[in-house]
């Protein structure tokens, strides 16, 4: 490749890519539209030239200097780098393409609008319990280019977001599962069709048709599933629930009553994880043990406390209306705290979740309130404290208060984790002394 590798976007992944390229002695050029202190210090430490993002018309000149362009997740589809690269005949890559080039160890992958991190965590645990060193990577805290530095790893379990799949030159992981599909990230993708197309690339590099794993209960995923795919989620699929037992290809794995989590979405995640883990080298008993012990991840339908007869549930990770509808179907009649920064998604169907009452928060408070208008009691709150107080009043006695925002957190918080922790802090202060 003639010319330096241009790395666009110096978030967690971009910085890991810089590090990986530099330590391998490759010539690198870094660009960030809004470089923060971490980006600057990373470039400085590695002696990499950090170029200010040019105006849209000057991108071609910059890209022509490069041999390849590695694009960080979250760079929107309409970014001028894509047109410039196409015009200059320069290849766009995702970090997974670099990992492919440098490391030949097996990897399996998980994509879907909801449930990715949960299934990655389950698969890694099932493989670990089977005696393999399984390392979660990708959309997690550890980019794949950093994870491959772990010489002890036997297998990588990759969380593959639509951003990563869309940018990859050739995505390769086997087995690979697509969990579900619902509108999301329309602030990044040009439209829904582009988002669906990106997700469908998860199966591009499977070693055999059966390594394409599909949720047949999801109409979009089922319609996209290649011939010979391994299915789950429907009564006649390879993996299904029958008479209260999770069954994989005719073998009973675990009784649902023994599972630590068994809401409807938990059962779909469990089936997906079993299929992927078994095809990646796990054994059935390890899968069963994992499901008996896995109590879920923080901020995903996590029980916080019960105060004065009201249960509080933190589902801050729900950043799409689809995720919030899933949460409401698991907790019918809950008082819902909902809102934040909407990612260009349609809120119209949310009222179908039929909450007892709604407290709308954040930038999207007004459109959220409008979405539920007429279906239940709706109020708006201007802080999380106020939201919890209002929700507690509405749930008084025997109810459930569910924080499931259906939006990103970036209006009031730095992340969904920060938002969830704030909610937990407020709830626990109610539990502690009865006052906020």
Protein language model regions, located:
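N-terminal leader/targeting and accessory segments in enzymes
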Residues: 1-94, 98, 430-433
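Residues in the short beta-alpha loop(s) of Rossmann-like NAD(P)-binding domains
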Residues: 11, 34, 140, 218, ...
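Residue-level signal for inorganic ion chemistry
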Residues: 21, 69, 110, 139, ...
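Short internal beta-strands
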Residues: 27-33, 212-216, 337-339, 354-364
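Beta-strand->loop->alpha-helix junctions that form or flank phosphate-binding loops
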Residues: 32, 52-54, 93-97, 135-138, ...
């Amino acid at each position: 490749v003639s010319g330096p590798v241009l790395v666009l976007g110096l978030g967690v992944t971009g910085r890991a890519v810089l590090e990986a390229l530099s330590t391998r002695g490759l010539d690198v050029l870094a660009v960030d539209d809004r470089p923060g202190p971490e980006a600057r210090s990373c470039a400085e430490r590695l002696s990499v030239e950090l170029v200010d993002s040019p105006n849209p018309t000057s991108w071609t000149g910059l890209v022509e200097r490069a041999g390849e362009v590695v694009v960080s997740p979250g760079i929107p589809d309409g970014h001028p780098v894509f047109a410039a690269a196409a015009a200059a005949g320069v290849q766009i890559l995702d970090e997974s393409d670099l990992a492919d080039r440098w490391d030949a160890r097996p990897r399996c992958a998980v994509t879907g609008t909801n449930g990715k991190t949960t299934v990655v965590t389950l698969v890694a645990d099932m493989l670990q319990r089977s005696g393999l060193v399984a390392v979660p990577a990708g959309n997690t805290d550890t980019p794949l280019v950093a994870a491959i530095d772990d010489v002890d790893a036997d297998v990588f379990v990759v969380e593959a977001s639509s951003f990563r799949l869309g940018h990859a030159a050739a995505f390769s992981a086997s087995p690979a599962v697509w969990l579900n599909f619902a509108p999301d990230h329309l602030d990044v993708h040009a439209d829904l069709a582009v988002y669906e197309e990106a997700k469908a690339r998860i199966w591009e590099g499977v070693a055999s048709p059966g390594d394409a794993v599909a949720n047949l209960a999801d109409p979009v995923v089922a319609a996209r599933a290649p011939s010979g795919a391994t299915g789950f989620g429907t009564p006649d699929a390879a993996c299904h629930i029958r008479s209260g037992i999770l069954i994989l290809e005719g073998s009973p794995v675990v009784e649902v009553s023994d599972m630590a989590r068994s809401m409807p979405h938990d059962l779909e995640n469990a089936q997906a994880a079993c299929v992927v883990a078994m095809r990646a080298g796990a054994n059935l008993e390890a899968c069963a043990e994992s499901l008996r012990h896995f109590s879920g991840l923080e901020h995903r339908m996590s029980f916080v406390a019960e105060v004065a007869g009201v249960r509080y549930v933190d589902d801050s990770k729900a950043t799409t209306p689809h995720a919030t509808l899933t949460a409401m179907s698991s907790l019918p009649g809950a008082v819902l705290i909902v809102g934040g920064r909407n990612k260009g998604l349609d809120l119209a169907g949310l009222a179908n979740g039929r909450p007892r009452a709604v407290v709308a928060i954040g930038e999207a408070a007004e459109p959220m309130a409008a979405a539920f208008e007429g279906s239940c009691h709706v109020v708006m709150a201007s802080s999380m404290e106020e939201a919890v107080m209002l929700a507690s009043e509405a749930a008084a006695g025997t109810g459930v208060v569910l924080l499931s925002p259906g939006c990103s957190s970036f209006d009031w918080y730095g992340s969904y984790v920060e938002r969830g922790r704030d909610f937990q802090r407020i709830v626990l202060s109610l539990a502690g002394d009865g006052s906020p």
